[in-house]
From Swiss-Prot:
A family per Pfam: Mito_carr
Record keyword ATP-binding present: no
UniProt topology in membrane: Multi-pass membrane protein
Coiled coil (UniProt feature): none
Keyword annotations from UniProtKB, A to Z: Cell projection, Membrane, Mitochondrion, Mitochondrion inner membrane, Repeat, Transmembrane, Transmembrane helix, Transport
Similarity comment: Belongs to the mitochondrial carrier (TC 2.A.29) family.
Membrane-spanning residues: 22-39, 87-108, 126-143, 194-211, 228-247, 287-310
Positions of Solcar repeats: 20-114, 124-216, 225-316
Catalytic activity: H(+)(in) = H(+)(out); chloride(in) = chloride(out)
Any one GO biological process: positive regulation of cell population proliferation
Gene name of the record: Slc25a27
Species this protein is from: Mus musculus
Name of this protein: Mitochondrial uncoupling protein 4
Keyword set includes tRNA-binding: no
Length: 322
């Protein structure tokens, strides 16, 4: 039988392995995002509270922030905006994670298997995993930056309504169109530098930790490549990713949400370094960990749901384990 005919008989996952992995990771990310999104919204609102730089614009939000703490913030959203507002911005978040998760997973596996090369005994040095995780995060996040920008800005719409400010967007597609009209293509990549910095750190924590812990457990303990190993590995990856990524996440959220002039330039911060300095000087070092608790409480179950779902649908689709 000709080679072309044999290829046609192969399952789709073997004929288009990277496309399949992209789609499978997108499906797993969608499940995880829907399950944990309220914590992401709460985290974003917390990160914006007490933003010292707003005082330069005479914004009263600094003194009138209605919430303090994770629980009161979440309850306040439910009481004042409605229960379903806990999922405000979930549509662009799903768009973002399909692109982001698909991009990072395909990139990481390509680097691991082809560029750096895992040894025959499945040993993969930590330093290679760190570099691979960071590079995968950078590429995945750069591709997904427009959707992340829309998600962050839509998450703050409920707060604007409470402060008596006009809403900026009528929906997801209007948000994309408005940002594009006001800032051009470059406007869709506002905040991309702190965004990829955060993604590099988060994926160094998530991908590197999961891959390293999982294969350590499989190779050095009685545990097999099953749901127990996946669960333990994802718990570790969620914690490390939250610790490494929260400061960059605070900076990213503030830069993306800041008001802009007619040229699309930020009115509060010149760069991610400027935002970092202003936050520490105006609010203290711990301001970089605003929203850490909901971030950790979200990252851990998100990581668990994602990895358990991803490993399972890979198995069901005939794709080798991660």
């Amino acid at each position: 039988m000709p080679i072309a005919e044999e290829e046609k008989l192969l399952p789709l996952t073997q004929r288009w392995p990277r496309t399949s992995k992209f789609l499978l990771s997108g499906c797993a990310a969608t499940v995880a995002e829907l399950a944990t999104f309220p914590l992401d919204l709460t985290k974003t609102r917390l990160q914006m509270q007490g933003e010292a730089a707003l005082a330069r614009l005479g914004d009263g939000a600094v003194d009138s922030a209605p919430y303090r703490g994770m629980v009161r913030t979440a309850l306040g959203i439910v009481q004042e905006e409605g229960f379903l507002k806990l999922w405000q911005g979930v549509t662009p978040a799903i768009y973002r994670h399909v692109v982001y998760s698909g991009g990072r997973m395909v990139t990481y596996e390509h680097l691991r298997e082809v560029v750096f090369g895992k040894s025959e005994d499945k040993h993969y040095p930590l330093w290679k995993s760190v570099i691979g995780g960071m590079m995968a995060g950078v590429i995945g996040q750069f591709l997904a930056n427009p959707t992340d920008l829309v998600k962050v800005q839509m998450q703050m719409e409920g707060k604007r309504r409470l402060e008596g400010k006009p809403l900026r967007f009528r929906g997801v597609h209007h948000a994309f169109a408005k940002i594009l009209a006001e800032g051009g293509i470059r406007g869709l990549w506002a905040g991309w530098i702190p965004n990829i910095q955060r993604a590099a750190l988060v994926n160094m924590g998530d991908l590197t930790t999961y891959d390293t812990v999982k294969h350590y457990l499989v190779l050095n303990t009685p545990l097999e490549d099953n749901i127990s190993t996946h669960g333990l590995s994802s718990l570790c990856s969620g914690l490390v990713a939250s610790i490494l990524g929260t400061p960059a996440d605070v900076i990213k959220s503030r830069i993306m949400n800041q008001p802009r002039d007619k040229q699309g330039r930020g009115l509060l911060y010149k760069s991610s370094a400027d935002c970092l300095i202003q936050a520490v000087q105006g609010e203290g070092f711990l301001s970089l960990y605003k929203g850490f608790l909901p971030s950790w409480l979200r990252m851990t179950p998100w990581s668990m749901v994602f990895w358990l779902t991803y490993e399972k649908i890979r198995e069901m689709s005939g794709v080798s384990p991660f």
